Design a protein with these regions (language model features):
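Conserved PLP-anchoring active-site segment centered on the Schiff-base-forming lysine
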Residues: 71-89, 118
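Active-site PLP attachment segment
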Residues: 95, 175, 193-222
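Conserved core segment of the aminotransferase class I/II
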Residues: 212-236, 247-253
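Catalytic PLP-binding core of fold-type I/II PLP enzymes
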Residues: 150-182
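Conserved small/polar residues in nucleotide/adenosyl-binding loops
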Residues: 264-271
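PLP-dependent aminotransferase-class I/II
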Residues: 99-145, 150-157
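Conserved N-terminal alpha-helix of the aminotransferase class I/II PLP-enzyme fold
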Residues: 13-60, 83-88, 94
């Protein structure tokens, strides 16, 4: 039986498991400061054409989202998201629990547009009313929770409107690989680094046992990010497991080879909900 309930019902790709077995008894230092993670960071930077980016590894999507948002926002600031966005629907109020409001807005397809961002800013008096939450970040997913994808023009337009209002653009890439191989996609990996202040490449939903690679391109978001990881409970002691997996994941484009399967399952699940 094939289950479409989620895209992490099985373990890991055999090549990933083989890499883990090979390095299983290698003695390393902890907390992702080892040579395996250093190698993986270099591969991530090269693949996304962002040599100056900071790369951090997190166990899963929710801890990645909460850590990035908490690190980027001041106490009175909030994050704009589609009403179907993962941080608004499926994270048990994790963002609000950290003290930041999710400024959700209804969308027809799970995607945000410049017009929707402007509407949220209008509702919040363009950030000029001290009695209201000040939106400071835009959160999007690619692929979205509805299985839709962004085009390069759409991502560039969001980047532009974020610059207009002084907003950070944060892309949840839990299903990034699926988006990149989807029919109609015209984005390349380097486009995420070009247009986003911070994004992450997901592995949990695409053949890794666990792991997301957070990529920070905006210099303002880089300082003390590891402090925030630790404070939020995301500092993984056996960090070499991230490095080993992501190196296997990105070498020979394994991440894109596996992606058509996960994208097909995602679309099948979403279609079944409409029956």
């Amino acid at each position: 039986m094939i289950s479409f309930r989620n895209d992490y019902s099985e373990g890991a790709h055999p090549q990933v498991l083989a890499a883990l077995e090979k390095n299983n008894l290698v003695t390393t230092c902890g907390y992702s400061m080892d040579d395996f993670c250093a190698e993986a960071r270099g591969i991530v930077r090269a693949r996304f054409s962002c040599p100056q980016a900071d790369v951090h590894f997190m166990v899963g999507g929710t801890i990645a989202n909460t850590t990035v948002i908490a690190a980027a926002l001041r106490p009175w600031e909030g994050v704009i998201a589609a009403d179907t966005g993962h941080i608004n629907v499926h994270e048990t109020g994790a963002i609000e629990a950290s003290g930041h409001k999710v400024c959700a807005i209804e969308t027809p397809d799970g995607k945000l547009t410049p017009a929707l961002v402007r509407e949220v800013m209008r509702r919040h008096c363009d950030g000029q009313d001290e009695h209201m939450v000040l939106p400071r970040m835009v959160y999007i997913s690619d692929a979205t929770e509805l299985g839709t994808i962004y085009t390069k023009a759409e991502l560039a337009a969001l980047h532009e409107v974020c610059g207009e209002y002084g907003l950070y653009l944060f892309l949840d890439g839990a299903r990034m690989a699926a988006a990149l191989v989807a029919e109609g996609n015209d984005l390349q990996p380097e486009d995420f680094a070009t247009y986003c202040d911070v994004f992450y490449l997901g592995g949990t939903k695409n053949g890794l046992l666990f792991g997301e690679a957070v990529v920070i391109t905006n210099e303002a978001l880089k300082p003390h990010f590891r402090n925030m990881i630790k404070q939020r409970g995301g500092m993984f002691a056996k960090g070499f497991l991230f490095g080993t997996q992501f190196t296997a994941y990105l070498q020979d484009e394994l991440w894109l080879t596996m992606a058509p399967v996960s994208y097909t399952h995602l679309r099948a699940h979403e279609t079944s909900q409409d029956l």
